[in-house]
């Protein structure tokens, strides 16, 4: 699902909200979440999951075109851990 598809679904289910209002709310929420992660904060949405940063240590990688070894610096990457309710719901839908 894309961001625009999410906006359409919310507008369809919440008829009293305009498309512009929903778009602004989603953009604001995503911007706030991005800022929180950028400052090292953890985000927890109960029943859905949590977002945090995981550190990837420096390592030696390979350039896929040349096969030459390349040193890669350590970095932080966003990580999502689904909550129990989300895991249960996903597994329930597969049955």
Curated annotation (Swiss-Prot):
Q: Cellular component per GO?
A: chromosome; cytosol
Cross-referenced SUPFAM superfamilies? IHF-like DNA-binding proteins (SSF47729)
- In the UniProt record, the signal sequence range is none
Could you name the domain of life of the organism this protein comes from?
Bacteria
- InterPro entries with a match to the protein in the record: Hist_DNA-bd, Histone-like_DNA-bd_CS, IHF-like_DNA-bd_dom_sf, IHF_beta
Alphabetically sorted, this entry's keywords are: DNA recombination, DNA-binding, Transcription, Transcription regulation, Translation regulation
Q: Name one GO biological process term.
A: regulation of DNA-templated transcription
Residue ranges with Basic and acidic residues bias: 72-95
User: Which SMART domains would you find in this protein's record?
Assistant: BHL
Q: Which GO terms describe its molecular function?
A: DNA binding; structural constituent of chromatin
- Give the region (Disordered) as residue ranges: 59-95
What are the TM regions of this chain, as residue ranges?
none
Q: Which family does it belong to?
A: Belongs to the bacterial histone-like protein family.
Outline what the protein does: This protein is one of the two subunits of integration host factor, a specific DNA-binding protein that functions in genetic recombination as well as in transcriptional and translational control.
Assembly and partners are described as: Heterodimer of an alpha and a beta chain.
* Name this polypeptide is given: Integration host factor subunit beta
Classification from the root reads:
Bacteria, Pseudomonadati, Pseudomonadota, Gammaproteobacteria, Pseudomonadales
Which gene is the coding source of this polypeptide chain? ihfB
